[in-house]
């Protein structure tokens, strides 16, 4: 896989809608690098932006964009759709590669300094500029979770307008202060929501993206006081491997890895995990080779997980997000995110302040 990120930006307008291939796969083949679609709306004084395919293996936003662009309807406002990383999606097997093999994660480079001359940093700057230059009234970034999961939103700003955005797609969200260099962390002077549409291979995820995108582009007013519909999970922790620790997923402890999580771990994306729930196995050494980083950069793993005779158990009642069994992601990015639910959160705060 020696394909490089293209430097040129491809712009399309309404005239291209009739030329779009009938399938999403055919549409992908028509794109050659960063691709921007500008569609004029009924109200041409306002702009809304959709970014998608930052990760090449997360197709729901792309599928929804293809569906909407082909239906030839006029949006309520001007719409800019940015297809961020077609190169990764086109790399065989198609729609299976998060990023190009020799490149790093695009959604970790949006905070890179202007002097960073890596191709991927340049692509991130091009995308940021493409969003900022139209002065949008709202921005949606569409993703999929790596494992099977219901849809949820991720936001940084706890305000009604941003919650209204999320409510167009889902009624569940994470309010986070964690920073990883994502596009969501950038300042566009507009409400911004990341939508995780669900698992990348689930038809329901593509429907979430289509339904939400339709609402986002067709409504004259999207800030209509629907924020009370949204269930908020606050202060996620990012659970990662420590150092060069290894991980596997199995019904039994693996002798070839430091950490073994349950083979059915993805089910915890759909339900709370109770204190005392068995999670997996670990090496019996002195240190647990996992960390749970909070928004202040502090490791909270000892408040989340108990070890007992080489077994791992939940120490708190938690909601897990983005659990997946893809070894490359679990090893190089993170295992999952977790929010501690209210009853357990109160106990954690007592421990933190020494009560």
Residue positions per predicted region:
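Structured catalytic-domain cores with a bias toward divalent-metal coordination
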Residues: 1-355
